[in-house]
From Swiss-Prot:
InterPro entries: His_synth_HisIE, HisE, PRA-CH, PRib-ATP_PPHydrolase-like, PRib_AMP_CycHydrolase_dom, PRib_AMP_CycHydrolase_sf. One of its GO terms (cellular component) is cytoplasm. Gene3D superfamilies: MazG-like, Phosphoribosyl-AMP cyclohydrolase. It is found in: Cytoplasm. One of its GO terms (biological process) is L-histidine biosynthetic process. It is an enzyme of class 3 (hydrolase). This is Histidine biosynthesis bifunctional protein HisIE. It catalyses: 1-(5-phospho-beta-D-ribosyl)-ATP + H2O = 1-(5-phospho-beta-D-ribosyl)-5'-AMP + diphosphate + H(+); 1-(5-phospho-beta-D-ribosyl)-5'-AMP + H2O = 1-(5-phospho-beta-D-ribosyl)-5-[(5-phospho-beta-D-ribosylamino)methylideneamino]imidazole-4-carboxamide. PANTHER family: HISTIDINE BIOSYNTHESIS BIFUNCTIONAL PROTEIN (PTHR42945), HISTIDINE BIOSYNTHESIS BIFUNCTIONAL PROTEIN HIS7 (PTHR42945:SF1). One of its GO terms (molecular function) is phosphoribosyl-AMP cyclohydrolase activity. SUPFAM superfamilies: all-alpha NTP pyrophosphatases, HisI-like. Keywords: Amino-acid biosynthesis, ATP-binding, Cytoplasm, Histidine biosynthesis, Hydrolase, Multifunctional enzyme, Nucleotide-binding.
């Protein structure tokens, strides 16, 4: 069936153009609860990779765009009221930002599992490599590739917007979340200018002397 006809089956009007999406792996384990607007579902259908709509950021992102933990979509189901979706996916890596396989990894009332802090900063190097690949070999539906396509003005604007998000964040968890976004957009800005993270590290070492 044509993509546009599939999109028409969803009741977008009920929740202001956004529908909840339950995500399961092929064994039936629930991985996360996400959201889609029409464009996110379109990108998912076109690419076969899960794209979700961030209500807090007001934008679409491919799952795993930054982490590499993409979700290949095997099947999409719709509920009886046509206002919720179920994605059956093959995940590459954990679904949760905490590093857990599923976002539903604890019972109600259980304390949060705190992951050990990694001070190696190796994740920044890994992220830099992913961003470089998106620049050199654009991927359809990739947020990073889209930034490079739109060019300098868009990249610098997004970096500025993310810096403001850090400044206005009040809660500890929100500050961590926004700083992570800021670091990602900083790496995009550096990569756009063909500046490596290593060069910045060398400058910091020089200043320490």
């Amino acid at each position: 069936m044509e993509i546009e006809k599939l999109l028409e089956q969803v009741n977008w009007e009920k929740n202001n153009g956004i529908v909840p999406v339950i995500v399961q792996d092929e064994k039936g384990e629930v991985l996360t609860l996400a959201y889609m607007n029409k464009e996110a579902l379109r990108k998912t259908l076109e690419t076969g990779i899960a794209h979700y709509y961030s209500r807090s950021k007001g934008r679409i992102r491919m799952k795993g765009e930054v982490s590499g933990n993409i979700q290949t979509v095997k099947e999409i189901k719709i509920d009886c009221d046509n206002d919720a979706l179920l994605l059956i996916v093959s995940p590459k890596g954990p679904a949760c930002h905490t590093g857990n396989y599923s976002c539903f990894y604890r019972k109600l009332g259980e304390p949060e599992r705190v992951l050990p802090i990694d001070y190696s900063l190796s994740i920044l190097k890994e992220l830099e490599e992913i961003i470089k690949r998106r620049k050199e070999t654009p991927v359809e539906g990739s947020y990073t590739s889209k930034l490079f396509k739109e060019g300098r003005e868009k990249i610098y604007k997004k970096f500025g917007e993310e810096a403001i998000e850090v400044l206005v964040a009040e809660k500890r968890e929100r500050i961590i979340y926004e700083v992570a976004d800021l670091l990602y957009h900083l790496l995009v800005l550096l990569t756009y200018n063909d500046i490596s993270l290593g060069e910045v590290m060398n400058e910091l070492r020089r200043r320490r002397k």
